[in-house]
Amino acid sequence: MYKTILVTLDGTPTDRAIIEHIKQLAKLTQGRVVLLHVADGWAARTFGPDAVSPEITEDTAYLHKVRAEFQSEGIPAEAELAYGDPPKEIVKWVEQKGCDLVAMSTHGHRFLADIFLGTTSRHVRHSVRVPVLLLRAK
């Protein structure tokens, strides 16, 4: 079933819900996990992989910590840091890694921002050809 699961992380407490859910799912399917965070600050959007900032350092450390958490439970996991527009980068990584499931936490609606800008999850689910698991954080 799901052999390669892309888990998008934003570095906030809402990540915990999807992390715990995917640990269980990956164990059931004996799948591997690709953890992805898209740095989208000014430095990341301007300089891409050459960006240097405290945020990039924190993002990298966070990804490595979460990867170690999966690996300590026997789940093959890799951590990837992308740069730029989150929806576009997520879609690109789904295709590059051959993922057969995308897993995302959602923050819930923020009304006006969602109406005018849309949400990352909406853009992703309308752009990929694989299932998208959306889990609302508590």
Spans of features found by a protein language model:
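Small/aliphatic-rich secondary-structure junction motif
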Residues: 1-49
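Structural beta-alpha unit
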Residues: 68-102
